[in-house]
């Protein structure tokens, strides 16, 4: 993601005056790790408030209580910019159908394809429009600790209720490094740690989570390893959300998960709420499993992007490298919608297969 521009804070002519750090004093060692005076972070003056201020204070227990959190999709205009009208409609539908939180700019929301300016803007927009009705959890994680610190400060500055943090990927670190990375951001506010080894290439082991759980700001873990891991956490008092839609029913009712952070709820939020709130429902779960399998036939968010376009909820615009599912899979989705019932899905238009030529692929935006 694009680096954020820094500014000299010690200029006498600056409109915002900050004290110059005493460099020699700040280098005193109280332990084996040196901590900079401001965590090497400076405010971005184009943001609505300084990144060191906090707009909302949310109790971590409020985050721990959430059962249905939607990893919200980010729709696009034909030129690749955010389609905020479609985005607002989608978030409104989530609220109306009982979703309690949204992950903004996560994997499903394609935060990995956003600049940090886009990312923080979308978090702030979501807070300003919907923050009184739904918990806004900003994905401000990064494989760079410096970027994670900076983005998380900005996310809390524009009002997000909690942060989602992934472990450093590609340039993997040691378990001790994982712990130090998360400790660098945990003090800022309520935090969900996201464990998805299939994407990061590294599992976050329970011993790391148990160490981090000593911090009261750890709301819990979005866990994608499986239900045995879910059970291990719940038996040890760690809140956990299933990160696998196809396992979330059993995670909730058999293994003690608090709920789910879901992709499928973009499409059927009311049914996902029913699955998490109304007790064991094997019949409904079985009904939804084929849809969940379809959504993850290719890596997320390819399936959800294709489905929302077919439902007419978002434009058929893809930021590369994502491309739509082929026609054969789109025809399968039409059949799935009819089997489950169009009334359970978001939007009001008839589901369509769409032609290949209907899709717009954007590489420069």
From Swiss-Prot:
EC number: 4.3.3.7
Keywords on record: Allosteric enzyme, Amino-acid biosynthesis, Chloroplast, Diaminopimelate biosynthesis, Lyase, Lysine biosynthesis, Plastid, Schiff base, Transit peptide
Principal location class: plastid
Record field: catalytic activity: L-aspartate 4-semialdehyde + pyruvate = (2S,4S)-4-hydroxy-2,3,4,5-tetrahydrodipicolinate + H2O + H(+)
Keyword Plastid found: yes
Top EC class of this enzyme: lyase
SMART domains given in the database record: DHDPS
Superkingdom of the organism of origin: Eukaryota
Active site: 194 (proton donor/acceptor), 222 (schiff-base intermediate with substrate)
Pathway assignment: Amino-acid biosynthesis; L-lysine biosynthesis via DAP pathway; (S)-tetrahydrodipicolinate from L-aspartate: step 3/4
One BP annotation, GO: diaminopimelate biosynthetic process
Residues that coordinate or bind pyruvate: 108, 261
Marked site: Part of a proton relay during catalysis: 107, 170
SUPFAM superfamilies xref list: Aldolase
Functional summary from the UniProt entry: Catalyzes the condensation of (S)-aspartate-beta-semialdehyde [(S)-ASA] and pyruvate to 4-hydroxy-tetrahydrodipicolinate (HTPA).
NCBIfam families assigned to the protein according to its UniProt record, in alphabetical order: dapA
Annotated protein name in UniProt: 4-hydroxy-tetrahydrodipicolinate synthase 2, chloroplastic
